């Protein structure tokens, strides 16, 4: 008689559950994505079997730490910041619903409201549809982001990693959520805070940071947002590069020699790249770049003026979030 073999049914998916003491048990529905520090999955609360959006959540599972007494510092920083952000209570800042340190699996779970798409994906899908993305819609999105940043900055928090993927969007409610606060920094001074920036995406970092400045201004977030707004209206990453020297070159292509624009800064990074130190000619110009690639039609030059103030090379002269919200682009009708 032939040996009996155990039958397996690969088409039957094993359900996965996550238990939180305060808010109950959640069932995994699908994966959303994975990044450097972990993955995000879509879950639903099994207490309610309806399919309403209010029952759907996003669960961030932070990667396992190697030693039993070691917890990922980035995630602990994010938990700390999320508690502060919940206190701030701005409608455009992502708040956590529940959190848990799972000692058994050596993971950190952060439960948040579910938002179906990020700004990069939404604009990539709809940028050429003028009936969906026009100046009025774009202006509303920009104002929401500035409102969130203004609340952070007034509470002495610098996000430090503003990019399209970290701004989620709900098309049904037309509301954004700034998320991913793992790199955020709190500062105790009204002007700046000295610390090491260990993360962030090069393409969205200002030249003063790329040149080695350790003083983090709130203007870091404003530069990043300026880059984001240009990307959303053009479909192009304006300062795309493989490393920080590439990004500095792209910045010089637009603005001209940084050694002239930031004479008081340590230009060690410039000395490492001959292409940067030899540049003498003026840049192509920010407004010229936007007008060349823009896919959103603007009624006047107000938007160009705002992003020019946001992408001011000197961080001290860069517009702040509160003043940006009062800019004439938001006041004028479009």
Predicted regions and their residues:
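Glycine-rich ATP phosphate-binding loop
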Residues: 39-65
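Conserved N-lobe beta3->alphaC-helix segment of eukaryotic protein kinase catalytic domains
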Residues: 56, 61-88
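Conserved HxN/HPN-centered segment at the entrance to the catalytic loop
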Residues: 87-98
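Conserved activation segment of eukaryotic-like protein kinases, specifically the C-terminal portion
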Residues: 194-209
């Amino acid at each position: 008689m032939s040996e009996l073999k155990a039958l397996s049914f690969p088409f039957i998916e094993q359900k996965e559950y996550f238990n939180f003491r305060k808010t109950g048990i959640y069932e995994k529905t699908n994966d959303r994505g994975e990044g450097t520090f972990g993955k995000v999955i879509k879950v639903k609360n099994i207490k309610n079997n309806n399919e309403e959006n209010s029952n759907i959540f996003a669960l961030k599972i932070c990667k396992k730490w190697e030693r039993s007494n070691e917890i990922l510092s980035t995630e602990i920083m994010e938990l700390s910041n999320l508690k502060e952000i919940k206190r701030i209570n701005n409608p455009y800042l992502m708040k956590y619903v529940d959190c848990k340190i799972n000692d058994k699996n050596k993971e950190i779970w952060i439960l948040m409201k579910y938002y179906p798409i990020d700004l990069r994906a939404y604009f990539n899908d709809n940028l050429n549809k003028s009936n969906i993305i026009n100046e009025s819609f774009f202006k509303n999105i920009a104002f929401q982001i500035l409102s969130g940043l203004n609340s952070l900055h007034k509470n002495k928090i610098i996000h430090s990693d503003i990019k399209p993927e970290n701004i989620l969007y709900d098309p049904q409610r037309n509301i954004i959520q700034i998320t991913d606060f793992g790199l955020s920094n709190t500062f105790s001074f009204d002007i700046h805070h000295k610390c090491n920036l260990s993360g962030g995406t090069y393409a969205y970092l200002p030249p003063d940071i790329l040149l080695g400045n350790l003083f983090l201004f709130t203007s870091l977030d404003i530069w990043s947002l300026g880059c984001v707004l240009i990307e959303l209206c053009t479909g192009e990453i304006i300062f795309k590069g493989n490393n920080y020297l590439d990004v500095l070159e792209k910045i010089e292509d637009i603005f001209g020699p940084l050694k002239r624009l930031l004479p008081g800064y340590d230009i060690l990074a410039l000395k490492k790249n001959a292409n940067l130190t030899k540049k003498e000619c003026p840049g192509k110009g920010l407004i010229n770049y936007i007008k060349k690639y823009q896919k959103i039609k603007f009624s006047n030059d107000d938007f160009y003026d705002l992003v020019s103030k946001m992408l001011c090379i000197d961080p001290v002269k860069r517009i702040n979030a509160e003043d940006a919200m009062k800019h004439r682009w938001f006041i004028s009708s479009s």
